[in-house]
Each structure stands twice: as C-alpha cells, then as structure tokens.
C-alpha cells in the first residue's frame, strides 16, 4: 500500500469518527416557545451534559488514532524490506528466463555451424604470413571458401558416390564436389622490404561455390 493510500484511509476513518452520534449523557434541549410578552426570541437550542466532555468522548476515536499510528509505522519499515526483496526475485526470474534462451541459442548456433554450406570467410593477415617468400609490412584481407557441399549434391553426385561405395567403379576415383572460389579479388600490388614491386593475382576469393 502506498503512502497516499494510507493517508486516504486515515482521513476516511477520522471523518467516520467525527460523525459518531453524541455520547450518552448529552442531549439537545427543545426550543422554547416564543415569548410574545417579552417581544424577543430566546436562544433556540442549548447543549447540556451530565458529565465532562473529555470523559464522554467515544472510545472509537482512540482506536482510530492507534490504528493510524500503527499503520504509518508499519509503512515506514516496509519500503526498505520490499526494495531489498524485489531485486532478488527479479534476478531469479531473469536468471530462470535466460537459461533456456541461452541453451536454445547455443543449440541453434551449433546447428548452423554444423550444417552450414559453402561460404566465404575473411581473415586479416600480413603478406608475409601467406608463406610465399615475401618479406614486407604490407597487409591484406584474405578471403577463402569453407564449408560443406553436401546440400549442393545433384543426383549424379549421389549415384557416383553409391557406385563408388559398392565398388562398381573400382578402376576410377570419383571426385566429390568441394567448396571452391568461383571468382577472385582484384590483384594486389605491394613493395617488399627491399623495395621490389610485386603483384599477386587470384590470391583471394571473391565468391564461392561447390564445384
């Protein structure tokens, strides 16, 4: 319950207590008849009491005040406990919700890596790292083809594979489709450490296919 809700409840209770009927021992005097002989009207009402006011005031008012004070004290103590408890529950819910998602995500990533086809992959290298005997500080983005070509197999490829397994084609080796470049990047020109000019042609893949 918020603070304003408690204040509203307290106001309603105070209004209810103030609307209680007068306690026993208090009564209203009836209005006296008009005195025509004196030519003026006396005071119409008067309040009389058999006892003092503080002793006859309803006990319910004290109960209402006690309830209001207890509610305010309880409300002051509760926010800190709720603030400490809610984050724990929220963290537990988030952890429980994240675990299945993480496991499903890992499963999907594993399936994509296992069943992916022939794709183009890039890596940042130095020309010297290519192992062609060049000593240079020149760098490049080397792209290569990788992946499986099983999904690209035609009926012809399947028949050849079956015949090879059954040893019907023992005299010949049957080649399988592999992931290869079908187009290459532009030529790469560079100077080595001895200021010798070199050109690399068809050095990096541009598009890949199963051939």
UniProtKB/Swiss-Prot annotation:
Copy out the induction comment.
Expression in C6 glioma cells was transiently induced by treatment with phorbol myristate acetate (PMA), but not by forskolin.
Give the UniProt tissue specificity note. Expressed in both the central nervous system (CNS) and in non-CNS tissues. Expressed in a highly dynamic pattern in the anterior neuroectoderm during the early stages of neurogenesis between 7.5 dpc and 10.5 dpc. Beginning at 10.5 dpc, expression begins in mesenchymal tissues of several organs including the digestive tract, kidney, testis, frontonasal mass, tooth primordium, tongue, mandible, whisker follicles, ear, eye, limb bud and in distinct regions of the brain. Also expressed in the heart, ileum, liver and muscle.
**Gene3D superfamilies attached to this UniProt entry:** Cystine-knot cytokines (2.10.90.10)
Q: Where found?
A: Secreted
Q: Where is this region: Disordered?
A: 76-113
Gene Ontology, cellular component aspect: extracellular region; extracellular space; Golgi apparatus
* Alphabetic keyword roster: Cleavage on pair of basic residues, Disulfide bond, Glycoprotein, Growth factor, Secreted, Signal
Q: Which PANTHER family match?
A: GDNF SUBFAMILY OF TGF-BETA FAMILY, GLIAL CELL LINE-DERIVED NEUROTROPHIC FACTOR
What does it do? Neurotrophic factor that enhances survival and morphological differentiation of dopaminergic neurons and increases their high-affinity dopamine uptake. Acts by binding to its coreceptor, GFRA1, leading to autophosphorylation and activation of the RET receptor. Involved in the development of the neural crest.
Quaternary structure and partners: Homodimer; disulfide-linked. Interacts with GFRA1 coreceptor and RET: forms a 2:2:2 ternary complex composed of GDNF ligand, GFRA1 and RET receptor. Interacts (via propeptide) with SORL1 (via N-terminal ectodomain); this interaction affects GDNF-regulated, but not constitutive secretion. Also interacts with SORL1 in complex with GFRA1; this interaction leads to GDNF endocytosis and lysosomal degradation.
Q: What is this protein called?
A: Glial cell line-derived neurotrophic factor
The source organism is: Mus musculus (Mouse)
Give the gene name: Gdnf
């Amino acid at each position: 319950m918020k603070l304003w809700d408690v204040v509203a409840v307290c106001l309603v209770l105070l209004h209810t207590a103030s609307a209680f009927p007068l306690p026993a021992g208090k009564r209203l005097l009836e209005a006296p008849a008009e005195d025509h002989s004196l030519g003026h009207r006396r005071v119409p009402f008067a309040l009389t009491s058999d006892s003092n006011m503080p002793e006859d005031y309803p006990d319910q008012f004290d109960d209402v005040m006690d309830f209001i004070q207890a509610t305010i004290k309880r409300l002051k103590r509760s926010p800190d406990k709720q603030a400490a408890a809610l984050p724990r529950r929220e963290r537990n819910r988030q952890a429980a919700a994240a675990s299945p998602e993480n496991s499903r995500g890992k499963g999907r990533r594993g399936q994509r890596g296992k069943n992916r086809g022939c794709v183009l992959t890039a890596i940042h290298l130095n020309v010297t790292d290519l192992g062609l005997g060049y000593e240079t500080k020149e760098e490049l983005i080397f792209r290569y083809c990788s992946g499986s070509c099983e999904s690209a197999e035609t009926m012809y490829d399947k028949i050849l594979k079956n015949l090879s397994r059954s040893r019907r084609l023992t005299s010949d080796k049957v080649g399988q489709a592999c992931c290869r470049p079908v187009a290459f990047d532009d030529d790469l020109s560079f100077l080595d450490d001895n200021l010798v000019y070199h050109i690399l042609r068809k050095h990096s893949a541009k598009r890949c296919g199963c051939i």
